[in-house]
């Protein structure tokens, strides 16, 4: 009975023997995903600039299954070091989850936007993703296998939901994802991105101006298309787990929406009307 239980446990681990590097892994989506990947058997390297939080995540996961690397994704040497450190520690890199991202102050008029803010967002959200892709590919191409996932956004395919800098940067993430999927397919490397709905992470709260988590969730639930289930960061982590696992072995170049159908809605033309029950 115990042997059967152990076998079932091993089968349930969808990333057994895999090694993952997660940028922005010290909080929010990255932290939750790091913990989930570890639960599914992966060794996880957490890269971030939030050192104290990063070390706390490693302590929560366990030092035998995770490590923390200080990494500013806008610095190529830092990204290169994070990749090399991961390979040196665990022997390989199977999964690169490029998740680090920022936003700028929410100024609705472009004439009020600052060039410095725009460049800062692109530096992290676009250049950072590019560097993670580049250095992941550097070690994955010789192995002829690997999996690169990036965090995009609903703003990767629609306008009006975020600042110009953030929207433009996430469109760029999707473009990089599709282009790299074409290049790296010949090596058996999959490249995908995730586009989540609004979440009460530090980034989401900062951009929306809503600090109270319950209030944030209520706003999202009211605005959302799919009523009933509450959207949370675990939903995004589970989507990342799917893309990272062999269950998605033939999925590449895909932008996976975790938005309850919001991105396909037309909020102006409302054909489907039910009387209040």
Swiss-Prot record:
It holds the Pfam family adh_short_C2. It catalyses: (-)-secoisolariciresinol + 2 NAD(+) = (-)-matairesinol + 2 NADH + 2 H(+). The active site is at residue 166. It comes from the Eukaryota. Its EC number is 1.1.1.331. InterPro entries: NAD(P)-bd_dom_sf, Sc_DH/Rdtase_CS, SDR_fam. One of its GO terms (molecular function) is secoisolariciresinol dehydrogenase activity. Belongs to the short-chain dehydrogenases/reductases (SDR) family. Homotetramer. This is Secoisolariciresinol dehydrogenase. It comes from Forsythia intermedia.
């Amino acid at each position: 009975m115990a042997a059967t239980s152990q076998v079932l446990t091993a089968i349930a681990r969808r990333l057994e023997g895999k090694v993952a590097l997660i940028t922005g892994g010290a909080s929010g989506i990255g932290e939750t995903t790091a913990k989930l990947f570890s639960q599914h058997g992966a060794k996880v390297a957490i890269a971030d600039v939030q050192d104290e939080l990063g070390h706390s995540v490693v302590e929560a996961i366990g030092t035998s299954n995770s490590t923390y690397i200080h990494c500013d994704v806008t610095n190529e040497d830092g990204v290169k070091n994070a990749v090399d450190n991961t390979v040196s520690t665990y022997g390989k890199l199977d999964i690169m989850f490029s998740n680090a991202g920022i936003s700028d102050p929410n100024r609705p008029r472009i004439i009020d936007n600052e060039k410095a803010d725009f460049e800062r967002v692109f530096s992290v959200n676009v250049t950072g993703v590019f560097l993670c892709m580049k250095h992941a590919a550097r070690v994955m191409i010789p192995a002829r296998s690997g999996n690169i996932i990036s965090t995009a956004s609903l703003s990767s395919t629609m306008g009006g939901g975020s600042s110009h800098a953030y929207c433009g940067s996430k469109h760029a993430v999707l473009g990089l994802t599709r282009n790299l999927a074409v290049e790296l397919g010949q090596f058996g490397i999959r490249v995908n991105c995730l586009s989540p709905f609004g979440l009460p992470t530090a980034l989401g709260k900062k951009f929306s101006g809503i600090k109270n988590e319950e209030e944030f969730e209520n706003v999202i639930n009211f605005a959302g298309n799919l009523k009933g289930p509450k959207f949370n960061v675990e939903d995004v982590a589970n989507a990342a787990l799917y893309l990272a696992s062999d269950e998605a072995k033939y999925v590449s170049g895909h932008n996976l929406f975790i938005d309850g159908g919001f991105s396909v809605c037309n909020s102006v033309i409302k054909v489907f009307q039910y009387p209040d029950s």
